[in-house]
Amino acid sequence: MNFYKIFVFVALILAISIGQSEAGWLKKLGKRIERIGQHTRDATIQGLGIAQQAANVAATARG
């Protein structure tokens, strides 16, 4: 019975320590994904601006 309690306690300590070390790795991955999303958003906004300018030039050329 005592062995079981000690085993559970050690298992919990290991799970907590492994969980904390994994959080750093997961946080880095999350930041990379967030950065990719920001770059995609910025490129889309820039592309829409260029497309709007092209549409204005085409409309002006038609008269």
Curated annotation (Swiss-Prot):
Its main location: secreted. The keyword Transferase does not apply. Keywords: Amidation, Antibiotic, Antimicrobial, Immunity, Innate immunity, Secreted, Signal. Residues 1-23 form the signal peptide. The keyword Signal applies. One of its GO terms (biological process) is humoral immune response. Induction: Induced as part of the humoral response to a bacterial invasion. It holds the Pfam family Cecropin. GO terms for cellular component: extracellular region; extracellular space. Cecropins have lytic and antibacterial activity against several Gram-positive and Gram-negative bacteria. Belongs to the cecropin family. This is Cecropin-C. It comes from Drosophila melanogaster. The lineage of its organism: Eukaryota, Metazoa, Ecdysozoa, Arthropoda, Hexapoda.
